[in-house]
């Protein structure tokens, strides 16, 4: 009798534990069908969309943004982006690019390397799959290399669509948010996904990734800083209130913020967003085949490449005229961007000189706050890809405020340096090239590149083989 009671009690405890675990952090989906993250799995079902997605692989060339603008090496001194920052390529390369960047370094096992698991979060439909299977804590916990063999398929179908729904299986879009942290963010700004209009949903699925975010808690989980809103001021206020910083600047020791790519936020504030012109209208237009079939072109790209299907739907001006307008705005934004950079770079070096001259934390605190705010505003504008087209007025206003904050910092620094007996201009080292700027910071680029090469040659092939074996066991062959 006692043994029977013990067995029943153990079974009951196990059942309760199972229920608690399954309800924790979105741990298990109510759906019994496993999500298939392989984009090729939908090639027949959505042939037009798949065949138009594949050419996102055409953007083979890697453009080095640091080589183009070495100021950014100094602006991100002490942070991973000073090592390596390339311009965005097509979705097809999402996995390759995050593996190959120096920012993820060269982990030798699942517990090494500088980056958290969160760095996969916008790279693959495997992320949503793993969250379903292991819960949010199960996904986010640990280092980036921990699930390298699990995160294998580049950005694609199951990132933005409910691929298991009858709507999708019958040829419909079935737009979906596939990550719980995005659902919470949309709720925070009063836009629950299920209540959104079709147009808003088309923007929100892009807003799963083309946004500002940060890592929080023990697991370094992704969170969008939208609790107070999505403008540059509202997010700055949020970060200041919680005392968050991404890193401490190597030169100035300022507690810095690294804007990611707040395209969704700046789009909302710009003329296109306010007029409900959404991402797909310009970057994934509806096109018509010769047989009259209409479908959404999934080769995300420049609207000028498909002018008649994009811009011409709203604008009466010629392609040449609109291109000239956009080029002019881009030049204006670039000019203000470089102006802000020169001021902020100088502020970092002047702050470093103030520390060297014996400045105290109390003396430096308001100066470092100005530098933090200046660079946050600069980064918010320049990290939002295409802001010169999405919201040029937002870019110019925000960059103007970055210049103002940097000027505030430098004015205070002039007084503080004079107080310490320094009245000559602070010398800035040679930062005319990417290599020179990295050298000025004492960065061992050869060592980093060798470490990355070893990782790509030894660790990544094992990941790929393990993934191949797992997918062969879990899914039907393609």
Curated annotation (Swiss-Prot):
Heme c 3 binds at residues 91, 206, 209-210. It is found in: Periplasm. Its EC number is 1.7.2.2. Heme binds at residues 119, 122-123. Binds 1 Ca(2+) ion per monomer. GO terms for cellular component: outer membrane-bounded periplasmic space. Substrate binds at residues 213, 261. Residues 1-27 form the signal peptide. Heme c 5 binds at residues 272, 311, 314-315. One of its GO terms (biological process) is nitrate assimilation. The keyword Iron applies. Pathway: Nitrogen metabolism; nitrate reduction (assimilation). It catalyses: 6 Fe(III)-[cytochrome c] + NH4(+) + 2 H2O = 6 Fe(II)-[cytochrome c] + nitrite + 8 H(+). Heme c 2 binds at residues 157, 160-161, 298. Ca(2+) binds at residues 212-213, 258, 260. Belongs to the cytochrome c-552 family. This is Cytochrome c-552. It comes from Aliivibrio salmonicida (strain LFI1238).
């Amino acid at each position: 009798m006692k043994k029977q009671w013990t067995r029943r009690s153990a079974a009951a405890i196990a059942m309760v534990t199972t229920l608690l675990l399954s309800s924790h952090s979105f741990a298990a989906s109510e759906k019994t069908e496993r999500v298939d993250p392989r984009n090729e799995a939908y090639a027949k079902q959505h042939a037009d969309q798949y065949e138009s997605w594949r050419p996102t692989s055409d953007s083979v060339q890697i453009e080095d943004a640091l080589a183009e603008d070495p100021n950014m090496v100094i602006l991100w001194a002490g942070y991973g982006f000073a090592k390596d920052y390339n311009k965005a390529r097509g979705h097809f390369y999402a996995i390759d690019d995050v593996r190959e960047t120096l920012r993820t370094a060269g982990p030798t096992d699942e517990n090494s390397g500088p980056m958290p698991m969160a760095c996969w979060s916008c790279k693959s439909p495997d992320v949503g799959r793993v969250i379903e299977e292991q819960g949010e804590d199960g996904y986010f916990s640990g280092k980036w290399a921990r699930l390298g063999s699990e995160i294998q398929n580049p950005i694609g179908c199951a990132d933005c669509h409910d691929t298991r729904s009858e709507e999708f299986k019958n040829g419909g879009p079935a737009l979906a948010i596939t990550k719980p942290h995005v659902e919470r963010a949309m709720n925070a700004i009063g836009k629950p996904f299920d209540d959104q209009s079709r147009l808003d949903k088309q923007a929100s699925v892009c807003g799963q990734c083309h946004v500002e975010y940060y890592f929080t808690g023990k697991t370094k989980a992704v969170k969008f800083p939208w609790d107070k809103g999505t403008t540059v001021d509202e997010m700055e206020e949020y970060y200041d209130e919680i005392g968050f910083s991404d890193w401490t600047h190597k030169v100035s020791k300022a507690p810095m913020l690294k804007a990611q790519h707040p395209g969704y936020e700046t789009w909302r504030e710009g003329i296109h967003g306010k007029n409900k012109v959404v991402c797909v209208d310009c970057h994934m237009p509806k096109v018509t085949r010769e047989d009259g079939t209409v479908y959404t072109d999934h080769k995300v790209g420049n609207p000028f490449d498909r002018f008649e299907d994009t811009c011409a739907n709203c604008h009466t001006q010629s392609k040449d005229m609109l291109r000239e307008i956009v080029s002019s705005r881009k030049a204006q934004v670039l000019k203000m961007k470089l102006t802000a950079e020169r001021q902020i770079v100088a502020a970092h070096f002047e702050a470093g000189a103030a520390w060297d001259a014996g400045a105290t934390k109390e003396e430096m605190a308001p100066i470092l706050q100005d530098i933090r705010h200046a660079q946050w505003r600069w980064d918010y504008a320049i990290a939002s890809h295409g802001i010169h087209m999405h919201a040029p007025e937002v870019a110019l206003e925000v960059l103007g405020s970055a210049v103002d904050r940097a000027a505030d910092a430098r004015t205070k620094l002039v007084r503080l340096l004079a107080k310490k007996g320094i009245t000559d201009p602070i010398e800035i080292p040679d930062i005319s090239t990417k290599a020179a700027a990295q050298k000025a910071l004492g960065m061992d680029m050869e060592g980093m590149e060798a470490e990355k090469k070893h990782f790509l040659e030894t660790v990544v092939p094992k990941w790929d083989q393990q993934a191949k074996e797992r997918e062969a066991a879990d899914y039907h062959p393609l």
